[in-house]
Amino acid sequence: GAVAQTTPTWFYYDTLALRYLGVGRFNQMYPLASILRHGGKVTLGSDYPVSWIGKDALNPMFNIEMAVTRQQAGNPEVPVQARVSERLSVDQAIRAHTSDAAWQLRLEDQIGTLEVGKLADIVVLDRDPYVSDPYSIHTIKVDYTFSDGRLVYRRP
């Protein structure tokens, strides 16, 4: 099946794109929810170092928030990147960073989900993104990171 690999850092209301593409094509940009509804897969990455948000692009929580809101992280006042119906759920955005990304790399038997026999690459967050205000997801911090089951990072 088809895989759309993109970065949510592009999902902000872009007046230049609207002007150059026109309303019809502008409203067709980034149809991620439609791709998922039709059986495709979506994977998300950072686009670092060329992304407009700089080093924040390296933080998946920024990308997850922008995939969920289709707005600049932490900025609910800016217009929504058309179409609101193309927003991803928190679960879809997390899967796009984990299990679906592993599938795209053909490594789903080794990484991407927590299962016996797979590498234990785990982050422990300070808050649950599933119940957090969507506009605060970018502020969620990583408390611990485990790589292949070993603690490699502990937030000071």
Q: Regions from the language model: what does each represent?
A:
Residues 2-131, 135, 140-148:
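His/Asp/Glu-enriched, well-ordered alpha-helical/loop segment
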